[in-house]
Every structure is written in C-alpha cells, then in structure tokens.
C-alpha cells in the first residue's frame, strides 16, 4: 500500500504543478493586461516568477521553512532525546538521517520538511518535548518520518511554495486594482481587444479575487488523507498504536503556537498550529483529532 501511495504522491506532484501554474498564469494575465499592456506578457512573467520561486523553495525548503518558524538546528549533544528518537525512526523507515531542529514554543507540535528523504529535516517544539513521554514522542516523530518516506513532504513543499506565490501575486494585483491606475485603461485599447482577450481578462480577474482561496482548497484536497496515512505509517514503524493515540490526545489539548505561523506552512505541522474556530474550521488542513484517533483504534 505504501509503495502505491508513493507513486500516487509523485503523480499528484505534477497535478499540483499544473493547477497552481494555471492559477499563476490567469492572475498574471490580468495583471499584464491591465498594467503592462500585454496579457500574455504578464502571464509569461508570472509563470517565470512562479517557477523560479517554486524551484527555490523546493531546493531551499528546509532552510526557508525552518527560518520562517524560528527553528534552531540541534545535534546529539544538544538534544540527545529528540535526536535519538529521530535516528531510530529513520533507521526503521530505512531513510537517511534527517536534520533535527527545535522550535522554542510552549505549545505541542512538530513538522517535517525537505524535497526528498536525502535532504529532509524534522522539527519539534520545546512544549512537545516537555510533555510527551518516549512512546508518544516516537509516535509523533514516526508520523513526521512517514511523511518523508512517503514523499508527502515534496507535495507539501510545492503546495506551500506555489500557494505563497499565488497569494502574494493576487494580493499585489488587488492592491493595484484598489488604488487604480494602470496602462491598459483607455477605450481605444479596450475597443481593439479581441473576444478571446476579453474572456481571458474576465477569467483572470476572477482568479485574482479567488486565487488565494483556490490555492488553499488545493492544499486541503491532498492534506487530510495524507495525515491519515502518516498516522497509520507511524504505527507501522513503532508497532505501538496506543503511543500514537496518546500523543494525538495530548496534541488535541495543546494551545495554539505563540509565534506567527504562515498560513501556507501551517499544513506541514502534525497538529493545527493556530487552533482557529468558527467558519475557519472549514479550511483546516488537518482532519479532526477525534477522527484520526478512531481510525487508529480500528487498526
């Protein structure tokens, strides 16, 4: 099952690229048409920027994501308990030893990043290390190592990178629309536009408004099932379902993280780092803890 999931994740990587670059292209077309005088020129520029940003994030994802979350790298001497658990789980999973980081935050959470098992990293908060016992910590780290082994991290990294690029470009475009201006404003230009240009303009303007939401929904579409698989894979590594269940129950009672967590990188964490409520729950990247626990009990 795991090998099939790895193959599916690789296919999803290309599907994600197509969807996100389509959104980038549509937003870029609107910006280019209205402010650069060339819709297709804006589309090409947006795609080039998005491609460079995505490639940079993929190959620099570990350093970028760790810096965004204020993580510091540790080793066997500075954090022996965490280091040894990561080492053990990586050995069982038969992947290279990931780099190990700690985030100074009293909440309980952990995440992994990196484009492949060869350049991955695992991070845990000080709150998690203070509360979890050895079996629970193994469950959490096993979950993160499973993300690495199943190539979930590559999908998440691409989603984080391109969702951030789309959101940034869409926000810039909306600000430009709000303040007015632009080079493509006169009637002569508009009267000379072809029907295809008008249709693309309308679609791109809609994309400018909806792109951040669409990018979030794409992340949601792949994130929740990925969490279920990582929970099950962690139990496969530890042979201790109760340890994973106990860890999830403790995570469910954890407070939100105190430091700011970027919306795009929130999906990387084992538990929702913001603990939002109300309608915002509709956009959770993680399934409810209670549902995750029930699935583990059925194993």
From Swiss-Prot:
One example of a Gene Ontology biological process annotation: proteolysis
Cofactor: Zn(2+)
EC nos: 3.4.24.-
Keyword terms, alphabetized: Cell membrane, Hydrolase, Membrane, Metal-binding, Metalloprotease, Protease, Transmembrane, Transmembrane helix, Zinc
Topology term for the membrane: Multi-pass membrane protein
TM ranges: 14-34, 39-59, 153-173, 198-218
Binding site residues for Zn(2+): 143, 147, 227
Homology family: Belongs to the peptidase M48B family.
Protein name: Protease HtpX homolog
Organism: Streptococcus thermophilus (strain CNRZ 1066)
Biological classification of the source: Bacteria, Bacillati, Bacillota, Bacilli, Lactobacillales
């Amino acid at each position: 099952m795991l090998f099939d999931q790895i193959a599916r994740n690789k296919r999803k990587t290309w599907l994600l690229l197509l969807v996100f670059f389509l959104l980038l292209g549509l937003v870029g077309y609107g910006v280019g048409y209205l402010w650069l005088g060339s819709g297709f020129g804006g589309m090409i520029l947006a795609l080039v920027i998005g491609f460079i940003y995505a490639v940079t994030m993929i190959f620099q994802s570990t350093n970028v994501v760790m810096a965004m979350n204020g993580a510091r790298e540790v080793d066997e001497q500075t954090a022996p308990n965490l280091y040894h658990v990561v080492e053990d789980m990586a050995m069982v999973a038969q992947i290279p030893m990931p780099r190990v980081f700690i985030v100074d935050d009293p909440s309980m959470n952990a995440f992994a990043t990196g484009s492949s098992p060869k350049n991955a990293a695992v991070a845990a908060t000080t709150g998690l290390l203070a509360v979890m016992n050895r079996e629970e910590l193994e469950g959490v780290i096993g979950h993160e190592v499973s993300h690495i082994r199943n190539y979930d991290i590559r999908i998440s990294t691409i989603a984080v990178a391109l969702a951030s690029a789309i959101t940034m470009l869409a926000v810039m475009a909306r600000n430009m629309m709000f303040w007015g201006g632009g080079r493509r404003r006169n009637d002569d230009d508009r009267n000379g536009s072809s029907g295809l240009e008008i249709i693309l303009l309308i679609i791109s303007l809609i994309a400018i408004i909806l792109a951040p939401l669409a990018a979030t929904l794409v992340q949601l579409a792949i994130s929740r099932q990925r969490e279920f698989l990582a929970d099950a894979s962690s139990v496969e590594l530890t042979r201790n379902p109760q340890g994973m269940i106990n860890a999830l129950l403790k995570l469910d009672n954890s407070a939100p993280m105190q430091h700011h967590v970027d919306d795009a990188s929130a999906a990387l964490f084992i538990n929702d780092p913001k603990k939002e409520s109300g309608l915002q729950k509709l956009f959770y990247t993680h399934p409810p803890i209670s549902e995750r626990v029930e699935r583990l009990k059925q194993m």
